């Protein structure tokens, strides 16, 4: 069964997608990667995509649909895909259903990792990275680990590029544009909303339970 996993920036989609890939032998399909791979392949379509991107223009749904169809012809992907970053709107969601139907496939589960903006802010702005061992901790969620960090607290530094205004803007834009998609999928019995504010392992366990059904 194919899976759609979506949620706002900072919700932990990438972490959970990788967990599903490893544990359940799935393939993570990102439209961004599809576009980049097509450009690298030096095809005529890839050249068109590169031109659009370099000119700051959006790649049309028609092109994305073509790449999705190409991927679905690969039998190793059959009913083993995690759709990452797609669909982003209702038209894309409708297109995806049509394309999957062409290949006698469906979406088995749609999982939404819901995380409040407050938690996202703390996750991003509270990040501290050890300049010696590169371990990443969070001053809001890992207070005890920070105090006991073997390299010493003095080596934990915050990143300069964690810009709160950018994070807030991305979050608000995502939630606004995704609301219609949520409404589209939430009517289905295979839709599950998970509180993405919990511990990573707890969220992973919830997803694993869902995939057993």
Regions flagged by a language model, labelled:
Residues 1-213:
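Glycine-rich phosphate-binding loop of ATP-dependent small-molecule kinases
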